[in-house]
């Protein structure tokens, strides 16, 4: 009886969760129907073969959100950037995006590494880039195999390989790198090692019974770079990435250079736990941890602090996604095409943001009396952050 009690509790909680969400409105829309064919996940022999196969599949299966299909395809297709230096290429880096995101997430960071002599490549994790419903049948093994295949391709080309990931992608690359001693270094942005939710472990059980917690009005799916909603199985597979990376780091600390960057006000990740893992399980003296927020409580001299409140730019604090983008990014920058006024579940906040000439910017859900907040979608310290990232290893 002792050993059956906990699984029983989990099942009961999952069923209660399903009961709570069963009243959510469901929409009859292609965004919420899985594609007629799955994204190919076979072992590719070259990056070009992989890139062309993915692009062809996206052309046939993506639910396009605007008339410029070519632009949408370019944002969601794996990309490659050759280094600007004329000398022979010796190092490569692979970028892995987060849950619901796209390869374009690394557009600004990737250019920095290409400028420093790296061959840069990105991947599209299965279930992404096409329609949110394509995350329903996905498993963590699909994502793990994608990372493994691309690493093996780059290694066969004779390059020293580093890995970089954002959020869920950071979990995947850390878990992989910890089992492959040939990986030179890690670059992790908002690593989602530990969720800020205490019930994330329920997602795998819930996903066995229901596909969606919340779909959202299809008209609100207007972000060309990422999904506006994710099925429950997406969160379930994220949970397994966090579980696997925690177990991996418990078994063996990561001993090569690593760069980690987090924001104190992350609405997705338990960043205090991420910092603790860095202090104890990332053992290389050249590693660096960037903390955006109040000065953290740590004695680790590898930790660097930046104040995340920047009144001159109407920034109250940093969001989970903001670390990746330059201030002049055409889509998410200070004057970008896609301001994120949907920064909480309160429709009044959304309307107030739309009608504000000078909103402030913050993490999801942040409120302050007398201020209207949109999501912060860029990093005013982007260059300083990348300088620290580049410092952990030299070409």
Predicted feature locations:
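Catalytic nucleophile-loop/oxyanion-hole region of alpha/beta-hydrolase
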Residues: 130-157, 162
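C-terminal motif of bacterial Sec signal peptides marking the signal peptidase cleavage site
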Residues: 18-19
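Serine-hydrolase catalytic core
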Residues: 83-86, 230-394
């Amino acid at each position: 009886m002792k050993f059956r009690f906990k699984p029983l509790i989990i099942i009961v909680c999952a069923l209660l969760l399903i009961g709570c969400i069963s009243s959510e409105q469901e929409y009859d829309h292609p965004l919420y129907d899985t594609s007629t064919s799955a994204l190919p996940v076979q072992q590719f022999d070259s990056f070009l073969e992989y890139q062309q196969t993915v692009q062809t599949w996206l052309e046939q299966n993506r639910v396009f959100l605007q008339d410029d299909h070519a632009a949408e395809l370019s944002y969601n297709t794996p990309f490659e950037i050759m280094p600007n230096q004329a000398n022979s290429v010796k190092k490569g880096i692979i970028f892995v995006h987060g849950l619901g995101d796209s390869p374009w997430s690394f557009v600004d960071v990737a250019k920095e590494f290409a400028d420093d002599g790296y061959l840069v490549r990105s991947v599209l994790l299965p279930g992404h880039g096409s329609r949110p419903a394509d995350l329903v049948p996905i498993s963590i093994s699909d994502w793990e195999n994608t990372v493994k295949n691309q690493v093996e391709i780059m290694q066969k080309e004779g390059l020293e390989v580093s890995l970089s990931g954002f959020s869920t992608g950071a979990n995947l690359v850390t878990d992989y790198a910890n089992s492959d001693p040939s990986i030179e270094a890690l670059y992790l942005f908002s690593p989602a090692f530990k969720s800020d939710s205490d019930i994330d472990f329920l997602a795998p059980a819930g996903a066995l019974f229901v596909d969606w917690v919340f779909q959202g009005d299809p008209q609100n799916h207007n972000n060309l770079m990422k999904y506006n909603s994710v099925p429950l199985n997406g969160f379930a597979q994220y949970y397994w990435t966090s579980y696997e990376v925690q177990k991996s780091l418990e078994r063996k600390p990561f001993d090569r250079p690593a760069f980690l960057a987090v924001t104190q006000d992350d609405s997705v990740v338990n960043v205090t736990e991420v910092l603790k893992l860095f202090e104890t399980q990332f053992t290389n003296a050249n590693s660096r941890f960037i903390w955006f927020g109040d000065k953290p409580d740590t004695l680790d001299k590898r930790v660097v602090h930046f104040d995340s409140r920047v009144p001159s730019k109407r920034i109250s604090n940093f969001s989970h996604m903001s670390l990746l983008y330059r201030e002049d990014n055409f889509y998410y920058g200070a004057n970008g095409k896609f301001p994120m006024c949907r920064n909480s579940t309160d429709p009044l906040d959304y309307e107030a943001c739309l009608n504000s000439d000078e909103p402030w910017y913050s993490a999801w859900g942040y409120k302050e009396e007398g201020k209207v907040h949109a999501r912060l979608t860029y990093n005013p310290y982007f260059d300083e952050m990348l300088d620290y990232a580049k410092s952990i290893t030299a070409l």
